[in-house]
């Protein structure tokens, strides 16, 4: 298989890894959404129905995760190795992924804090395309810098940990990079969550959060996000790297043995 040929294995493995990780950490995602909403935790649903909205995510996770790894691996193979490679590749891949994931993210988060069915939320959203545009911008505003930063850290940590631990090097690197990224970028996640739940401009959301809760309003769910991101990314990328190695999927620039 040449460098110019489409490699279906990373695409498939990336999609399936995303499904596994999303399903396992979804209850934590629900709790974080309810903590970060403008409602009280109990008003938003408390600890009830933690898997509400999962169907919309599962439908979109496979194509979004698959497209991410397709673009990421493709871009990596066409640049010189290094930090800039990982930064650019992850950023471009995440923009593509967000275009697929944004509608499902709106449905998921609205379903997580209300009793409205997924189908009803989806139907109302179709008639208000601006909600999707706001969601896409908010998601890109959070996910692109987060993913770029995260993958730069991940590639470095993975290389370091894998030198002494071939089995758990990737999960360890993913967990650490996920925790650091979540801690740094929680304010963007809070803003994105509130845009999805109550469509407003970025500026209005920032002003409202600060007015209602001060500077600490941007750190809602910090501890939960660090834990969930660390766990989720460890499962996601750990599974991806593990299955990829067993399928003999080559790295950029290596000769395929599949």
Swiss-Prot record:
GO molecular function annotations of the record: S-adenosyl-L-methionine transmembrane transporter activity
Keyword Kinase tagged: no
InterPro entries: Mitochondrial_sb/sol_carrier, Mt_carrier_dom_sf
Transmembrane spans: 11-31, 53-73, 87-107, 139-159, 171-191, 218-239
Subcellular location: Mitochondrion inner membrane
GO cellular component labels: mitochondrial inner membrane; mitochondrion
Coiled-coil region: none
Main location: mitochondrion
Protein name per its UniProtKB record: Uncharacterized mitochondrial carrier C1271.11
């Amino acid at each position: 298989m040449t460098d110019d040929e489409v490699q279906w294995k990373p695409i498939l493995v990336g999609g399936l890894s995303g499904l596994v990780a999303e399903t396992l950490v979804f209850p934590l995602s629900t709790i974080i959404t309810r903590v970060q909403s403008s409602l009280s935790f109990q008003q938003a649903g408390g600890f009830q129905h933690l898997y509400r909205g999962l169907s919309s995510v599962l439908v979109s996770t496979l194509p979004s995760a698959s497209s991410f790894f397709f673009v990421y691996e493709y871009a990596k193979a066409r640049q010189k190795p290094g930090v800039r490679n990982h930064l650019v590749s992850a950023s471009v891949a995440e923009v593509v992924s967000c275009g697929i994931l944004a509608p499902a993210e709106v449905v998921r988060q609205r379903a997580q804090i209300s009793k409205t069915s997924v189908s009803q939320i989806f139907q109302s959203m179709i008639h208000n395309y601006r909600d999707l545009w706001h969601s896409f911008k908010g998601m890109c505003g959070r996910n692109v810098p987060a993913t770029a930063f995260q993958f730069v850290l991940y590639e470095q940590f993975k290389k370091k940990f894998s030198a002494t631990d071939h089995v758990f090097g990737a999960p360890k690197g993913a967990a650490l990079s996920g925790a650091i990224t979540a801690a740094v970028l929680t304010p963007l996640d809070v803003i994105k969550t509130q845009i999805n739940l109550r469509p407003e401009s970025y500026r209005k959301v920032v002003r409202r959060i600060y007015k209602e809760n001060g500077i600490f309003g941007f750190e809602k769910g910090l501890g939960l996000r660090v834990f969930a991101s660390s766990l989720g990314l460890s499962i996601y990328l750990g599974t991806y790297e593990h299955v990829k190695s067993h399928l003999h999927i080559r790295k950029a620039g290596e000769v395929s043995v599949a």
